[in-house]
Design a protein with these regions (language model features):
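Active-site core of glycosidic bond-cleaving carbohydrate-active enzymes
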Residues: 1-215
Length: 215
């Protein structure tokens, strides 16, 4: 999943990833969460209960649908699996406190000190952005409005908790934390330059070595 963009760019991976999506859907947990692996083998590291996997790995279900739409124009797969995605996002929302989720594998195997809630909430936000987009694509206007509102609340909570708007530092200011804030758009636009400067400085402080995790 992590290299799906690369594979989709070089190869015809539609059927391969469509099967992966189907496997996740088949193993969706009763409360709505998705498993860490599909087919499910019982692993649920830092999951959110009911046999669900960590929130970053649960993102695979929506993320792969996005890839198939972008690379192959497959809107049908988004329509077909929308009910399962909605059930999952509502499950994630039920696990949030003040619009934040505090558990995940986070910056896995990073050499830096990590804040699990920062990474988990960023993944939660991305889930909600994707279902908002999918609701728009499939003409579910009420859902689109509902999830747009939820995304705004998650972003506001993230900024209040983790973003130092004066300096542009996110969390502990590690390269991964700065990159997550930038990539997911979880910062006020007016401090983007400061956030980038903090990212560059964080990398420089580590002798230009990569200290982030593997996913």
């Amino acid at each position: 999943v992590g290299v799906s963009r690369t594979f989709c760019y070089f190869y015809d991976m539609h059927n391969f990833y469509a099967k992966a999506i189907r496997d996740f859907a088949n193993d969706q947990r009763p409360l709505g969460g998705f498993t860490e692996t599909a087919p499910y083998n019982g692993i649920a590291d830092q999951g959110l209960g009911d046999g669900s996997g960590p929130i970053g790995w649960q993102l695979a279900f929506a993320f792969l649908q996005k890839q198939l739409y972008e690379y192959y124009g497959d809107k049908r797969i988004i329509e077909n699996y929308y009910p399962q995605l909605k059930k999952q996002v509502n499950f994630l929302a039920s696990k949030a406190e003040d619009y934040m989720i505090d558990r995940c594998i986070n910056d896995h195997e990073s050499l830096d000190q990590r804040i699990p809630a920062l990474f988990a909430t960023a993944h939660f936000y991305h889930h909600v952005l994707l279902i908002t987009e999918f609701a728009q694509l499939t003409n579910r206007k009420a859902d689109q409005q509902q999830y747009e509102s939820l995304a705004q609340k998650i972003k506001a909570a993230f900024i209040q908790k983790f973003v130092q708007t004066g300096t542009g530092k996110i969390g502990n200011g590690t390269p991964a934390e700065q990159a997550f804030g930038l990539y997911y758009g979880l910062i006020p636009e007016e401090i983007k330059t400061k956030v980038i400067q903090q990212l560059v400085q964080a990398i420089s402080d580590r002798n230009n070595h990569i200290t982030s995790g593997i996913f």
